[in-house]
Amino acid sequence: MNCLLPTLAATLLSVFLAPVAAAADFGAPMPDGEAVDIAAAASGATARTGEPALYRGRITEVCRKQGCWVVLESDGHSARVMAKDHGFSVPEDASGEAIAYGALEVEPVSPEHARHLVEDDGASAPAAQELRIVATSIRIL
């Protein structure tokens, strides 16, 4: 019993003092502010078009070729986050919640671009029109 107590105490202490995974930033410095949920952005997309803002969602897809885009999803709505001018990339195994900073656009998806996304990047077949965020930075939480 005397040996068990120190072992138990050490185990509990290591669990509580284990480092918490820090957020990872990619691209330009992330500005401070409140992020708009992707579902909320989708419902008012035309009102938000063109103005840089923070957008939040869960990563559901990542470009498998270069990590140059991710898809963020929230409550059944999604937006493809594209790295502006290919200015940054994210790890191909990125997952979890993320915040992107960039300009929201509602963009038609050409057949050529759809083919590129599916064949080269491993994406799901996109709709004829998609919500897109041209981002200067992304933070994976």
PLM region spans:
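Bacterial N-terminal signal peptides
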Residues: 7-19
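OB-fold and OB-like single-stranded nucleic-acid-recognition modules
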Residues: 21-141
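Positively charged n-region of N-terminal signal peptides that target proteins for export
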Residues: 1-6
